[in-house]
């Protein structure tokens, strides 16, 4: 849930137009840890025009969610269409499995939740928190959620916007633990 909702929260703080979309024809989605979330839209409600005007699609992590998304033809079509039109596609945790199914990791650097790289045949795995490779941004897992969101904000709205959100949320300070 962290890797799905942190980007949504940060994007809304940055005044980005955001819609959460459920793939399964129900507005309520349940996270891999049993937390219910109400999506703004369901996948069949997305028109081709809305997809054409999309600047970014974010695929959250978690299993079996990532597998379910990878097995949904319309999800793969949307990812490919947004990418082919010059939009950004991003995935976190197990989400890069979906990007591979869409053919978007070929010849690209990426990161993912440890162990998922063994299932990804294309692309070049790099063990880092966040990787930005052209139109593709990937992140390792829940602990990378803030960095992931800020990387996407910077790519779409500029460094100043990302810095503003980082300051507002104390993101840059959040990983500094006091030694006792």
Predicted features, each with a name:
Residues 1, 10-22, 41, 46-180:
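Active-site-adjacent pocket-lining segments in enzyme domains
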Residues 21-42:
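N-terminal beta-loop-helix "entrance" segment that forms/cooperates
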